[in-house]
Amino acid sequence: MFTVVSYLGILAAFALVTIGIFLVLRTIQLI
C-alpha cells in the first residue's frame, strides 16, 4: 500500500513540475 502511495506522490510531483515548466514557457512566449 505504501508503494502505491509513494508512486502516486511521485506522479503528482512530476505533474506539478511539468505544469510549472509549461506555464513558464508560455509566459516567455507571451513576452
UniProtKB/Swiss-Prot annotation:
Its main location: plastid. Keywords: Chloroplast, Electron transport, Membrane, Photosynthesis, Plastid, Thylakoid, Transmembrane, Transmembrane helix, Transport. GO terms for biological process: photosynthesis. The chain crosses the membrane at residues 4-24. Signal peptide: none annotated. One of its GO terms (molecular function) is electron transporter, transferring electrons within cytochrome b6/f complex of photosystem II activity. One of its GO terms (cellular component) is chloroplast thylakoid membrane. The keyword Transmembrane helix applies. It is found in: Plastid, Chloroplast thylakoid membrane. It is a single-pass membrane protein. The 4 large subunits of the cytochrome b6-f complex are cytochrome b6, subunit IV (17 kDa polypeptide, PetD), cytochrome f and the Rieske protein, while the 4 small subunits are PetG, PetL, PetM and PetN. The complex functions as a dimer. Component of the cytochrome b6-f complex, which mediates electron transfer between photosystem II (PSII) and photosystem I (PSI), cyclic electron flow around PSI, and state transitions. PetL is important for photoautotrophic growth as well as for electron transfer efficiency and stability of the cytochrome b6-f complex. Belongs to the PetL family. This is Cytochrome b6-f complex subunit 6. The lineage of its organism: Eukaryota, Viridiplantae, Streptophyta, Mesostigmatophyceae, Mesostigmatales.
